[in-house]
Amino acid sequence: LAPGSEVLDIGCGWGPIALSLALTQPECHVTAIDVNPHARTITRENATRLGLSNVTVAAPDEISESARFDALWSNPPIRIGKSELHAVLTRWIGQLHGTGTAAMVVGKNLGADSLATWLAGQFPTRPVEKVHSSKGFRLLGVGPERPEV
């Protein structure tokens, strides 16, 4: 990630992805969102405990639809249901800059392959790939925009 990058973690839970990014990429700003107030509280407490000042923790509706991100890293909330998950991903991947990318860890048995197919259809100007598979999980990547063919 380039210095100054804006990174988004959707469904941050207690903050493992957001806080790891903030620790290893101190020149970046990480926005961690979750609908669960308790999860947000724990993420804030963990960020404070770690002395991180480059993390913002918020509810999704607290983030402007005009906000743009350079990267989205997430273990997305698969269990909320397919239609709700699709709405969440449509919004947040749609808020990536044209050069922005997304990386999502999804359980193979939770529909990683069908999600990759859906992402490719939903975002035809962005390449979608199964970057890596291990121990029942897939890392799905959504690349920067390219011209439509």
PLM features per residue range, with description:
Residues 78-79, 107-112:
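Short "lid" loop at the C-terminus of a central beta-strand within the Rossmann-like core
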Residues 23, 45-48, 86-89, 117-120:
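Short, glycine/charged-enriched secondary-structure capping and boundary segments
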